[in-house]
Amino acid sequence: MGIDEAITDLTARISTASLEAVIRVKRRSDEEASIRVYAPVEHEEAIKAATQEQTLRLLTEEGLDVQVLVYDIATSLPPEQ
């Protein structure tokens, strides 16, 4: 799996866990990216549950470092890009 497929998979998992999530992706290299998720605080645990195991698997089995960072949309507004 490449970084683009990993990002697509994780963003789909996030969207399923929280329909209200605003997602911002920053690709740093062919093996590294960060996904910032701005969602209601009550969705944080569901998002983490949907992504945590997969991000660890990507790191240990695929060598891909994709960080998923969850922010409360009520206190942290997402950037435009």
Predicted regions and their residues:
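Short beta-strand-to-loop capping motifs
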Residues: 37-41
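Short amphipathic alpha-helix segments
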Residues: 2-17
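C-terminal low-complexity, charged extensions that often adopt amphipathic alpha-helices
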Residues: 68-70
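Short edge beta-strands and adjacent turn/loop segments
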Residues: 15-34
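Short, low-order "capping/linker" segments at domain edges
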Residues: 75-81
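Alpha-helix boundary/N-cap detector
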Residues: 2-5, 42, 46, 50
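Short, non-transmembrane amphipathic alpha-helical segments
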Residues: 10-14, 45-65
